[in-house]
């Protein structure tokens, strides 16, 4: 009874608790068809982004990852249009690669035993349908299981360094619809590094072991998805990207350590609503220190058509407690008022917009508002607490080539906050990764073929020495104040799927920061069967 009273107190009274129970019962009685996510690093996303500016997709989107059925519907819609042969071949390739079409019952690449040689040979022969270790299909129960083995070898060269690291890993991928209303996706990779210890620790985004002699790398992404006629619910462990961009998102970027989350979403016509709650890891966490709670809640409302996508949202990082239902509903807007009254919470707002003025051209804009005061907007410190990202993308109609220009300005003091509530997770910024008080100009060329992705990116960043570290208390100042440091990057990457099961990647990165030059070569091979 005491436990029930505690639950009721969260909703401020038994009547509200009873109403919530009725709402949950109504939700679970209005079941729809399930679905599951496609990971944000899947090669289908660059293809969909390139075709959005050509009007080949039904809706523009700027939230990743997306769901399997949504992507299949977009690819199917594209094949119904009069598009260039090169784009049609790419759509067919991804449609076959992502399809779950299989015969009813149980299938395995290892059973019967005599099938093993044929399964092994198929890894190296040309085909478009993706083979899997195990598949099972029976009415609404349709799942797959694939094993993963891989090898990465990376090199760092500079005037003073010549380092390398080797990663051998294995894993599993599981997904599908396990009932009429529940979808599931999970991928797991685990490996051990060898090579230079300091170069290895530079990949600390995924490292979980403090053993310098044998550091482990673990990658986990999973989500269980429940779709109903009222609301869609997800519980998972992973990360997201909000907003288009060729460098990184200024709102929420996907290149950070994953985190646990609960997500509620709903599509109604051209509008959609998304609520996200997550438990973050505090910065500079050590085994001997107390684990202080750090939570993240986000709300956003989107309007999407085939030519325009507009999203307004707000998010909050708070401590001192874990799940708080007031942060997981639109009531979070009242926290903006609390902030004006010296609340501890780190409350932010954001806007994302994409517009296709004419065929082939996409203009996108992302705005992140960390702190705003009307009196400061009329001074030379007006950019303090703001981050702005503007890009123009052009896709050629006859060949799958996309060129994008992008400018990103992150104002002084953006992302920082008092009382250890920096806009961060495990010492990594949730927003733009290079800190604040910076201007970054970039251009990218992206070329696609079935099974092949080629990308060249050039970026030029200038950063002021004042108010550029969000992990420390920062004063308001003018944009690019202090001594200017410059950093140029050239990144060339190739991802090649020899077959749908066997893929290679090669990336070369040249970095020149204040005339100090470094070069990186990242290479790898992965078999997923």
Regions found by a protein language model. Name each.
Residues 48:
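N-terminal cofactor/phosphate-binding cores enriched in small/glycine residues
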Residues 217, 309-316, 321-529:
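Exposed, low-structure sequence patches enriched in small/polar residues
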Residues 39-42, 54-62, 67-69, 74-309, ...:
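Outer-membrane beta-barrel channel domains
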Residues 3-13:
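Short, low-complexity, charge-dense intrinsically disordered segments
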Residues 31-34:
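Boundary at the C-terminal end of the N-terminal hydrophobic targeting segment
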Residues 19-29:
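Bacterial N-terminal signal peptides
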